[in-house]
Amino acid sequence: PLLQLNQIIISPIHQSVLKSSILEGMMAKKVTAVSFENLKDDSDSYPIVRSMSEIAGSAVMLIAAQYLGSANHGKGVLLGGISGIAPTKVIIIGAGIVGEYAARAALALGASVKVFDNNVYRLKRLQNNIGQRLWTSVIEPRMLAKQLKTCEVAVGALGSQTGRTPMVVTEEMVGNMRPGSVIIDVSIDRGGCFETSEITSHEHPIFMKYGVIHYCVPNIPSGFARTASQAISNVIMPLLLEAAE
């Protein structure tokens, strides 16, 4: 009802999770929708996607720290490490922008970080960007399953250029994880890379399965609205000013 005839909307569309009724309503009113996430710059990259990925990657460790606490039925452990206590073990699946910023945040907190990705170039780039040696591996199911058994936090940060994100963590792997550990599936807007993932919301962000806390909110940056808005403005304003000339 808020849409007007022939209206132009510049907004994130999230086509993969957009309800068909909303799309049909937009078509009926001949709405022109410009999708944030599909805007490219002169270098043929997606600047808004990059900014949102940086926010999501940094945020996942804050979210994980919250749900590891006893108040949220977590393991009651501090994300990171203090003197005399073994550091929290974090597994990151995906070495893109989200994975890089998640690794940065986890390392800054003192966690032990292990990164999986099937693209060796991305793994090398992540190590170079972070500036220190990291434990990295291609996604080999037996190795991944072994590491998931002993981790406190698992982050799904795989991307996909063709549609659905590869589902690399099976239900059996999740079932073998420690009770109270936390899964954050950042890839959920493209299907997710954990077989047990189901879309959640900011109002009801988590659910439990096999004793493991699942956080599967599709748009994590929207939980940090002011920062996300400023990042989007930094990209959109120059484009609008250029188009107006």
Regions found by a protein language model. Name each.
Residues 14-15, 31, 38-41, 118-120, ...:
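Short, ordered loop/turn segments at secondary-structure junctions
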Residues 23, 61, 102-103, 123, ...:
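Generic hydrophobic/aromatic pocket-lining and core-packing "Φ" positions
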Residues 1-67:
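Phosphate/diphosphate ligand-binding glycine-rich loop within oxidoreductases
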Residues 128-210:
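Rossmann-like adenosine-cofactor binding region
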Residues 71-159:
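Glycine-rich phosphate/diphosphate-binding loop of Rossmann-like nucleotide-binding domains
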Residues 37-79, 188, 193-245:
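Adenosine-phosphate binding glycine-rich loop
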Residues 5-6, 86-89, 180:
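Phosphate-coordination loops involved in phosphoryl transfer and adenosine-cofactor binding
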